[in-house]
């Protein structure tokens, strides 16, 4: 919820509150830049808290990360504006965004690791999809709050004080999440492996992950989902409103409806992956995004279509290119990595993919759309991200129901057993 609150704020109002002296296009690019700053911080947070999670446990790290994110999100709601303190306003905004990003870097990976290690074989996909459903619930809540603000407030009221309400209201979610995690038990897989006290169970050196085929495949899988998420949920909403002058209710209402439908899409994909494996659903969803990107975008940006038609097109591409892939992401990555490095490698692969694809994607989309004066770069980037996700899915091994206590990563060559030569028997 915290990141979606910010992403919609960056797309819809921050350009006027924190960058009012820039042109419309440049202000949107700068606002997307503050969005991207959080993704840079997420990599650092993924490394720090991922290593901690593999050493001291999943539970403690999840408590730390949710607290960091919640406090920063609430503080954004009390920031002074550019009109009040000038350039220090965006500086403070970026500072809070970076601290928020540090916690976010291990938040979803930690939750995904925890649920995967709790779930029994045969039900990991559906159970792990609860992480995506929780994130989707946050997206829905954030979108609903912003939509409500746009509905009840005038533009002047929204820019004067209304934009603060979504961030201040997040304190309720933070308190509940902290209470929930204080009462959480540690992952049984983590306890089992660490109780064994085996020398071979020590975490591998941090640099070794970059030699892992599983690490790069996971990063590629992340491109398809995270890149499309940044373009569709963040940039496209701002592009429709600021550049094409659409009613703000069109993208916010469409994303809200899409998030509601996601409560069917996400568990269905999780259940399906328990039946037919992780690879095939990944291949289907990425292929669908590639095929649908151009026709759906051509409808979304065309004002000659009815608002309902535009919203349907946005809902379709969002479910195929974002929510469907997110349903598969956490369990697939958890099963791809060995138990002693799972948290670290899952978090860093997700955040590297997120930084490159989603963190910088909206900025590049803004630049390319301004240069070309068209929506074509958005569709091309969605297809490109989905192609990377598709190739990664085709190359990855099937990891469904893999032993989560295994030390090695799934895509690595299995160690060969060298048998000692047997002495020949004398006749």
From Swiss-Prot:
Residues 1-7, 50-74, 119-132, 179-225, 273-279, 329-351, 395-427 are cytoplasmic. The keyword Translocase does not apply. It is found in: Cell inner membrane. Residues 96-97, 154-157, 247-251, 301-307, 373 are periplasmic. Pfam families: MFS_1. Keywords: Cell inner membrane, Cell membrane, Membrane, Symport, Transmembrane, Transmembrane helix, Transport. CDD domains: MFS_ShiA_like. One of its GO terms (molecular function) is potassium channel activity. The keyword Cell membrane applies. InterPro entries: MFS (IPR011701), MFS_dom (IPR020846), MFS_trans_sf (IPR036259), MHS_symport (IPR004736). It is a multi-pass membrane protein. The chain crosses the membrane at residues 8-28, 29-49, 75-95, 98-118, 133-153, 158-178, 226-246, 252-272, 280-300, 308-328, 352-372, 374-394. GO terms for cellular component: plasma membrane. YdfJ may constitute the C-terminal portion of an ancestral gene disrupted by an insertion of the cryptic prophage Qin/Kim. The N-terminal fragment may be ynfP. Belongs to the major facilitator superfamily. Metabolite:H+ Symporter (MHS) family (TC 2.A.1.6) family. When overexpressed in human HEK-293 cells forms an inward rectifying potassium channel. This is Putative transporter YdfJ.
């Amino acid at each position: 919820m915290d990141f979606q609150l910010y992403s919609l704020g960056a797309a819809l109002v921050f350009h006027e509150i924190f960058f009012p002296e820039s042109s419309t296009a440049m202000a949107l690019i700068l606002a997307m830049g503050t969005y991207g700053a959080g993704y840079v911080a997420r990599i650092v947070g993924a490394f720090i808290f991922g290593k901690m999670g593999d050493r001291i446990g999943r539970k403690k790290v999840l408590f730390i990360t949710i607290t960091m994110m919640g406090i920063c999100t609430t503080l954004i709601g009390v920031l002074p504006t550019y009109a009040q303190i000038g350039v220090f306003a965006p500086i403070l905004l970026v500072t809070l965004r970076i601290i928020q990003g540090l916690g976010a870097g291990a938040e979803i990976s930690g939750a995904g690791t925890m649920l995967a290690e709790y779930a029994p074989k045969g039900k990991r996909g559906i159970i792990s999809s609860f992480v995506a459903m929780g994130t989707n619930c946050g997206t829905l809540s954030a979108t609903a709050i912003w939509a409500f603000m746009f509905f009840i407030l005038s533009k002047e009221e929204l820019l004067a004080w209304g934009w603060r309400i979504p961030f201040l209201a997040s304190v309720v979610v933070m308190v509940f999440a902290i209470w929930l995690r204080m009462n959480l038990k540690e992952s049984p897989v983590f306890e089992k492996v660490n109780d064994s006290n085996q020398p071979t169970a020590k975490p591998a050196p941090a640099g070794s992950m970059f030699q892992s085929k599983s690490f790069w495949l996971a990063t590629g899988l992340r491109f398809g989902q995270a890149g499309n998420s940044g373009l569709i949920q963040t940039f496209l909403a701002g592009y429709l409103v600021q550049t094409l002058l659409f009613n703000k209710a069109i993208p916010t209402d469409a994303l809200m409806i899409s998030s509601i439908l996601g409560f069917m899409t996400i568990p269905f994909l999780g259940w399906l992956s328990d039946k037919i494996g992780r690879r095939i659903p990944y291949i289907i969803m990425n292929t669908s995004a590639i095929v649908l990107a151009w026709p759906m975008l051509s409808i979304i940006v065309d004002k000659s279509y009815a608002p309902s038609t535009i919203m349907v097109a946005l809902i379709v591409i969002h479910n195929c290119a974002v929510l469907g892939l997110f349903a598969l992401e956490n369990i697939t990555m958890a099963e791809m990595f060995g138990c002693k490095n799972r948290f670290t490698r899952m978090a860093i692969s997700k955040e590297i993919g997120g930084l490159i694809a989603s963190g910088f994607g909206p900025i590049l989309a803004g630049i390319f759309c301004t240069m070309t004066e068209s929506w074509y770069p958005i569709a091309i980037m969605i297809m490109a991200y989905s192609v990377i996700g598709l190739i990664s899915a085709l190359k990855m091994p099937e990891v469904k129901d893999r032993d989560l206590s295994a030390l090695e990563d799934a895509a690595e060559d299995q160690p060969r057993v060298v048998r000692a030569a047997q002495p020949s028997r004398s006749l």
